[in-house]
Amino acid sequence: IKRFAFEHYGAHVVLSSATSGWNTNTITLPHSIPALMYVGPGYCDLVLNPTNVLKGFTGRDARPWIKGVMVHELAHCLDVSRDMPSFTGRSIGTRSLAPGEAIKTATLEKHLEAGSRLPTQIWREALADSFAVGFWRMTEPAADQLVADLQTKRAGGDAAHSTNCWIEQAAKAPLPGSMPELLPWADAIREAAICTL
């Protein structure tokens, strides 16, 4: 993932300990997340717990699934980093925020608040899932099965991961011509799909 991120997107990825991620629902649970990407000042920090990533995975080969999870997390970092002043040297952007939340955002604090609300969580997951689906379709012979597995996982998941509408669009959209074009391709799917936030 480090080489892939740098070669295609100029992003630096740091790999952190699988036990450094915390899930925060109603209580804070250490080591409970499957994967998480923090956005650091100029880099992406990936936490990946392979045991948790593979919970519920029923396919024969786990490697493409794990690659897809890592690429999904990279998409989160690429998405949010475009909005951050430390990455862009300009004012705060709103591309990673749900359209209804973006119009209310003028400060970094408001941006961070909007990022924690459900519409923006779904908006961000839609991009990351579309990005992963495109990656699988461009690289994996068993992409159709991986996409079906992702749809099954999302159908039984939490509200923030209700992205099957976008996954369906990504599964049938004409693919980009190269990996560097994958992020704008996923952006276009997220923006054009008639899906509910």
Model regions and ranges:
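Zn2+-dependent metallopeptidase catalytic core
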Residues: 1-19
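Active-site scaffold of zinc-dependent metalloenzymes
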Residues: 25-64, 70, 74-81
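Acidic helix-start/capping segments at beta-turn-to-alpha-helix junctions
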Residues: 15-25, 88-99, 151-155
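Post-HEXXH active-site segment of zinc metalloproteases
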Residues: 80-125
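Sec-exported extracytoplasmic/periplasmic mature domains
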Residues: 6, 75-83, 132-141
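Long, well-structured alpha-helical subdomains associated
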Residues: 111-121, 130-197
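A structural signal for well-ordered alpha-helical segments within the folded catalytic domains
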Residues: 64-72, 122-133
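Extracellular/periplasmic catalytic domains that process cell-envelope and extracellular macromolecules
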Residues: 6, 38-41, 159
